[in-house]
């Protein structure tokens, strides 16, 4: 074993061997005994001595040990297989090498250290977003942790003993109210300057946002009515077997939303024909169709220029195709053709170079700066060459396009329903939408930016999607944006994939007649609620919403009541049921009489589907998924996913299943049907609602300063007056804009306060010591399987399986939970911990884990009282 630990330790200590012994004989005997091992001691004189770390390549995380060997008093240690070898990813065998540990060394098999000792980060690692841990967020400013509300028990400790229980409860309720009020005001001050917050609550921004949302909604309504008039919904059913037709309809809606014409809708027919024609080579042919189907000649050339990262075969095919088109255009000069072919050859060779150097490194994310510089140089050269080629070919293009215009042929349809997009995972709350737009506008084909709602658990960071036209080279744009920072925040964009399954199905029980009728009722109610909330059918934006008693102007709801009322033959049933017998029309059912067949009513389904399509296209609400897609007009796919009915259930269904489905579905729809919640006047006053007049008075008073007798100053302008009434008059006359700002600030705060669903910091509950029965985390059967991130602050980590009982056990810290029971089957010394509920932790046994044969023997006086501090 040339590189074992024992051999290496002996080599390190060899230079001290002669100094340790005064007996020459013993020294000679030692050297004679070990002479075979050390006869090549000149081994390291001729070359540079290897560092100690190189001997540990097989286990880099081991701690360096320089302790003397223990061969004086005990027999030589056997070279045993170490239990942590080959188990680096196993939490049971990896020692305590977690990111939380302060030491950073190897495995420690002493007493488990509590996590709260000095040197450990105060904020736990798992609280931060993953990008912060990986370094995508530039600086993590944790700031002061928010205060935690006291429990009633903690609050009682701060009260005098003379306070009775009723008074204590009253004071605690007042404390809670004050705490929440203060927390809300702090939150308002912390976020009032951020764009997302102002757009939600500031009076000026709220008005603009509502106007934009209303304009987008009316555009979607026009698209829906246009598609309905042209018969797109006539034979369309929302069933999973009609997925292709549904996708086609959604694409048509998107083309219309993007301002497309009936001519642009022809692209959908062309794509369908291409799919049917080229099924074997579907992927390649789809790409070709997408690139060239609806683009003009100029756009096709930019497309060819952008698709540099295709494989070399395709590059050669493209160049040969270009040559063919040039031949068909007319006989040019031979010299020009030679130059063009030479340039094409150069381009193709550069394409190959870029493919090997650029594409691979982009995918692996490991391109060096020098490579990126050379690539940018190549890109500039290629752009210059492409521009020169364009200038040469312009006259030819004009000649080619003139006969087309003369013939009066229609323009090619545009694929407006297809886009390219980038996804940005972390956008800081202080970055505005306008900044991202101005950054991305520099690149050709930019369309729009969408930002998600901020996430309180991720420090109010947002996700973003930047949409570009389909003709651009999205990977090149993504690469150019990689290292750009906005306000010290790396955007780190990635290419957003196209949606794979745009039509998804739910349970086929939804085809049943009873459920369909119930869905019609719910969908009609939902349409009515959303139309009233957005005032979509109101004549003017300022008009009040229609009362629910009046019929809606929405044509989709016309005569809807005809389908909501179920016709029953009650009189006939009463007459026939008086004898207690069942109606003769219903034959006795085989099997379970409570089961029924799924009954499908095509007429009802057609009515329901029109309502669901209205909800999906106009209000961006996916009925069967019971969710609303927010800001869908700004997303890359303006009509992306829809959920439809699944295939008919093969078996019969019970009446209970139908009722259960209806009940569950109505519960899921309740949040969408509820009116936007706002606090009542009384609750708002309790939470600190501000009065505009009082705030204006406070503003005037604070800006009226007395300098001396009959001498008053207005600090806003620096002018002096003889009395406070003159200062007041001056402020109202000369600083009216400041007064308006105060009123707007009050409205800003009140809008935030009255929103019942206002954003707030995630509530941090104080760590409560769980009882003995709660020592195991739910879902994790054994204490050794408890993840360290879920354990309370300051609690000692559980012992490693196989070493827990043998290690010296520390005292449980104050406030921490009792030591967890040993796992099931701990065996001797524990007397079945799960049955007795009071046994001390025994040695966990596991056949796959090697225990320590030299574990400390545990002795326990069975008559002694329970104590946690024993071996």
Curated annotation (Swiss-Prot):
Entry keyword set: Acetylation, Activator, Cytoplasm, Isopeptide bond, Methylation, Nucleus, Phosphoprotein, RNA-mediated gene silencing, Transcription, Transcription regulation, Ubl conjugation
Residues recorded with modification Phosphoserine: 4, 67, 74, 136, 492, 539, 569, 678
One Pfam family matching this protein: ARS2
One cellular-component annotation, GO: nuclear body
An annotated Gene Ontology molecular function: DNA binding
Modified residues (Phosphotyrosine): 8
Glycyl lysine isopeptide (Lys-Gly) (interchain with G-Cter in SUMO2) crosslink location in chain: 150
InterPro entries to which the protein is assigned, alphabetical: RBD_domain_sf, SE/Ars2, SERRATE/Ars2_C, SERRATE/Ars2_N
Record-listed N-acetylglycine modification sites: 2
Location of the region described as Disordered in the Swiss-Prot/TrEMBL record: 1-90, 272-411, 574-597, 830-849
Domain of life: Eukaryota
Modified residues (Omega-N-methylarginine): 828, 835, 845
Family: Belongs to the ARS2 family.
Its job: Acts as a mediator between the cap-binding complex (CBC) and the primary microRNAs (miRNAs) processing machinery during cell proliferation. Contributes to the stability and delivery of capped primary miRNA transcripts to the primary miRNA processing complex containing DGCR8 and DROSHA, thereby playing a role in RNA-mediated gene silencing (RNAi) by miRNAs. Binds capped RNAs (m7GpppG-capped RNA); however interaction is probably mediated via its interaction with NCBP1/CBP80 component of the CBC complex. Involved in cell cycle progression at S phase.
Quaternary assembly: Interacts with CASP8AP2, ERBB4, NCBP1/CBP80 and DROSHA. Interacts with LUZP4. Interacts with NCBP2/CBP20 and NCBP3. Interacts with MTREX.
Record-given protein name: Serrate RNA effector molecule homolog
Organism: Pongo abelii
């Amino acid at each position: 074993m040339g590189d074992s630990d024992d051999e290496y330790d002996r080599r390190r200590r060899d230079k001290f061997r002669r100094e340790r012994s005064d007996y020459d004989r013993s020294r000679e005997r030692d050297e004679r005994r070990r002479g075979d091992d050390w006869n090549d001691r000149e081994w390291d004189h001729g070359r540079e001595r290897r560092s100690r770390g190189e001997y540990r390549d097989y286990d880099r995380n081991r701690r360096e040990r320089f302790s003397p060997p223990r061969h004086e008093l005990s027999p030589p240690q056997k070279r045993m297989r170490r239990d942590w070898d080959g188990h680096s990813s196993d939490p049971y065998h990896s020692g305590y090498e977690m990111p939380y540990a302060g030491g950073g060394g190897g495995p420690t098999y002493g007493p488990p250290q509590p996590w709260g000792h000095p040197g450990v980060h105060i904020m736990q690692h798992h609280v931060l977003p993953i990008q912060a841990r990986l370094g995508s967020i530039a600086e993590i400013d944790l700031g002061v942790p928010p205060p935690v509300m006291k429990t009633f028990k903690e609050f009682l400790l701060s009260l005098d003993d003379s306070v009775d229980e009723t008074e204590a409860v009253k004071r605690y309720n007042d404390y809670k109210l004050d705490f929440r009020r203060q927390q809300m005001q702090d939150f308002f001050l912390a976020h009032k300057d951020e764009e997302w917050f102002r757009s939600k609550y500031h009076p000026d921004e709220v008005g603009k946002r509502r106007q934009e949302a209303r304009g987008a909604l009316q555009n979607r309504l026009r698209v829906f009515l246009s598609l309905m008039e042209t018969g797109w919904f006539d034979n369309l059913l929302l069933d999973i077997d009609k997925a292709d037709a549904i996708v086609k309809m959604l694409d048509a809606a998107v083309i219309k939303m993007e301002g497309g014409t009936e001519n642009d809708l022809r692209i959908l027919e062309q794509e369908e024909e291409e799919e049917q024609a080229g099924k074997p080579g579907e992927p390649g042919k789809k790409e070709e169709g997408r690139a060239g189907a609806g683009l003009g000649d100029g756009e096709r050339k930019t497309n060819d220029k952008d698709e540099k990262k295709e494989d070399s075969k395709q590059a050669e095919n493209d160049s040969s195709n270009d040559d063919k088109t040039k031949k068909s255009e007319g006989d040019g000069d031979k010299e020009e053709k030679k130059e063009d072919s030479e340039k094409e050859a150069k381009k193709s060779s550069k394409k190959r170079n870029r493919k090997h150097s650029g594409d691979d490194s982009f995918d692996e994310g490991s391109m060096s700066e020098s490579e990126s510089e050379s690539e940018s140089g190549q890109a500039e050269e290629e752009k210059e060459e492409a521009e020169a080629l364009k200038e040469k070919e312009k006259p030819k293009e004009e000649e080619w396009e003139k006969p087309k215009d003369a013939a009066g042929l229609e323009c090619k349809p545009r694929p407006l329903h297809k886009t390219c997009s980038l996804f940005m995972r972390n956008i800081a709350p202080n970055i505005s939408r306008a900044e991202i737009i101005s950054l991305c506008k520099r690149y050709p084909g930019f369309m729009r930016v969408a930002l998600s709602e901020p996430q309180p658990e991720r420090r109010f960071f947002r996700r973003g999607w930047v949409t570009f036209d389909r003709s651009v080279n999205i990977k090149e744009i993504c690469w150019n944006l990689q290292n750009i920072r906005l306000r010290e925040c790396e955007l780190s964009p990635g290419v957003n994939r196209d949606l794979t399954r745009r039509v998804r199905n739910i349970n086929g029980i939804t085809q049943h007649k009873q459920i369909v009728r119930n869905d019609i009722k719910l969908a009609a109610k939902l349409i009515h609620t959303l139309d009233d909330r957005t005032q979509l059918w109101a004549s003017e934006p300022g008009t009040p919403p229609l009362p629910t008693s009046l019929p809606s102007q929405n044509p989709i709801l016309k005569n809807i009541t005809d389908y909501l009322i179920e016709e029953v033959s009650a009189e006939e049933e009463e007459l026939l049921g008086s004898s207690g017998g069942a109606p003769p029309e219903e034959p006795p059912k085989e099997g379970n009489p409570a089961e029924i067949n799924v009954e499908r009513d095509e007429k009802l389904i057609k009515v329901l589907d029109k309502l669901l399509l209205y909800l999906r296209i106009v209000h961006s609400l996916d009925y069967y998924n019971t969710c609303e897609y927010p800001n869908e007009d700004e997303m890359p796919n303006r009509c992306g996913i829809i959920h439809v009915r699944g295939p008919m259930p093969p078996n019969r269904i019970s009446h209970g299943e139908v009722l259960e489905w209806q009940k569950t579905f109505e519960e899921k729809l309740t949040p969408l049907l509820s009116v936007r919640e706002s606090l009542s006047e009384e609750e708002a006053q309790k939470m600190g609602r501000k009065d505009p007049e009082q705030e204006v008075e406070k503003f005037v008073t604070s800006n009226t300063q007395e300098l001396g007798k009959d001498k008053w100053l207005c600090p806003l302008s620096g002018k002096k007056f003889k009395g406070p009434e003159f200062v007041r008059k001056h402020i109202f006359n000369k600083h009216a804009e400041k007064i308006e700002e105060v009123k707007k600030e009050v409205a800003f705060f009140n809008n935030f306060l009255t929103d019942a669903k206002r954003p707030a910091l995630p509530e941090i509950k104080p760590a409560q010591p769980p009882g003995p029965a709660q020592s195991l985390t739910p879902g994790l059967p054994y204490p050794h399987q408890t993840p360290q991130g879920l354990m309370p602050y300051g609690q000692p980590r559980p012992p490693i399986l196989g070493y827990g009982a043998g290690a010296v056990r520390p005292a449980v810290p104050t406030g921490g939970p009792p030591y967890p029971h040993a796992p099931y089957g701990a065996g001797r010394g524990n007397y079945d911990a799960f049955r007795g509920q009071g046994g001390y932790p025994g040695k966990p046994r596991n056949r796959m884990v090697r225990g320590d044969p030299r574990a400390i023997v545990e002795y326990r006086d069975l008559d002694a009282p329970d104590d946690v501090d024993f071996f």
